[in-house]
């Protein structure tokens, strides 16, 4: 029997891409899944698709920040696994509009914080719960041409780390998914920077779900669907000046395109 049989799972941003892949995989493992997305039609389509395959899912559209209470009502009980997958791919540099920075911070960081505030009291009381944060390799490294995205993804990773180090001894398991390019609408939104850096090694959303389930089974915090990211992360930590020089070379290549 799957470890997720009859568990109650929420996946935000699940109308397509990585979120839809996670929702389908949890349902295939026997969980009841809340499919959340800002687009009601997309959320409904994914939930219906899961149902057609014999799984259990309900669409709860709307802002990810407000989904926890509605999901509890829809599930008729507690939430066992929360996948904070909704994200905002904000390009731009330091001069990006204040509204762009604020939106990226709200979606990529504060939505996770707000969900955790609502989930933690019950998880700590019962001694179990699982928080999955879809971060990005940009949260471990950076992404050229996308300052708001890179900075807020670092924030998402930092919050996931804090949750793990603070509550793991009390039964709360935390996982941070940090892929590079994934063939989703967000990759297209990355524009020429995505074409230069991400597209050549892009993977399918299902591969991200596979990596998560492998990592959860092994109790890993960092989920790296692209194994080479571990090497980049190590290089950044051991010789940051060399790493920054290499990234600046990519920046100059991108500017010359």
Language-model features: locations:
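Conserved glycine-rich cofactor-binding loop
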Residues: 8, 15-16
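Active-site-adjacent segment of SDR/Rossmann-fold oxidoreductases
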Residues: 29, 141, 162-173
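Conserved amphipathic alpha-helix within the SDR
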Residues: 47, 51, 58-77
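Conserved mid-core segment of classical short-chain dehydrogenase/reductases
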Residues: 87-102, 125, 145-148
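Active-site helix of classical SDR
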Residues: 116, 152
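Residue(s) in the substrate-gating loop at a strand-loop-helix junction
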Residues: 136
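C-terminal helical subdomain
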Residues: 176, 192-232
